Amino acid sequence: MPAVMPMTTVTDIRTITRTPMIDALRLMAWLSPTYPVGAFAYSHGLEWAVECGDVRDAATLSDWLADVLEWGAGRNDMILCAAAHRATEAGDDAGLAEINDLALALAPSRELHLETSQQGRSFLDATLRAWPCPALSTVADRLNAEVAYPVAVGAAAGAHGVARAATVAAYGLAFVQNLVSAALRVAPVGQSAGTTILAALTPRVAALAEALHEAGLDALGSATLRLDLGSFRHETQYSRIFRS
């Protein structure tokens, strides 16, 4: 019997994907609050949630945002963004058009349809002007006048060769940031609380992006019925500052 027993060492190997600096900067610019898409005008139903008492403070805002991100449009938009990126990379113009039609059809109300289509068209037009490339011009020619926002972002990133996972993560974080910004204007929540909520939700965005950047369209689905109904009621809300 040997005096020294053989030992087996198990090493946990992890693959780290790094986004090139120029691509990271491009995503930061595209999804910046200063990008001319009009994101400041939309609250995605948050204004009604405040009006009816669903969002009353930082805790209820955090819960509301987490639900929208993980069970509502946040999750679906990340899937659609990834699908548009994949179709653009493959040169599948027909597939991209179908993804766009589906994305527009998923908007449950007139206001949420306007929110995604107006921002999508504005994003595509601005990106074509500032970051032109033949692949993106081809995409723009093939799509309808109405372009869903996540489809526009995914297609632009695919046309420019920006990594899909990074694109989906950046889109998801921008989705949450825009809603936190809206909350600061309409909910009893201050900047410190808003920043804390954003920090708490960032790991969830990263986890969703990791899980969804390769997901197919069959993964689409939502469970935010109260928000969807609220988007209808917002249309006739007596006093409001947002378009959704």
UniProtKB/Swiss-Prot annotation:
Coiled-coil parts of chain: none
Name assigned to this protein: Urease accessory protein UreF
GO molecular-function term, one example from the UniProt record: nickel cation binding
Keywords associated with the record: Chaperone, Cytoplasm, Nickel insertion
Matches recorded under InterPro entries: UreF, UreF_sf
Source organism (scientific name): Methylorubrum extorquens (strain PA1)
Localization: Cytoplasm
Quaternary structure (record): UreD, UreF and UreG form a complex that acts as a GTP-hydrolysis-dependent molecular chaperone, activating the urease apoprotein by helping to assemble the nickel containing metallocenter of UreC. The UreE protein probably delivers the nickel.
Gene3D superfamilies: Urease accessory protein UreF (1.10.4190.10)
GO cellular component: cytoplasm
Function field: Required for maturation of urease via the functional incorporation of the urease nickel metallocenter.
Pfam families registered for this protein in UniProt: UreF
Encoding gene (name): ureF
Family according to the record: Belongs to the UreF family.
Keyword Metal-binding recorded: no
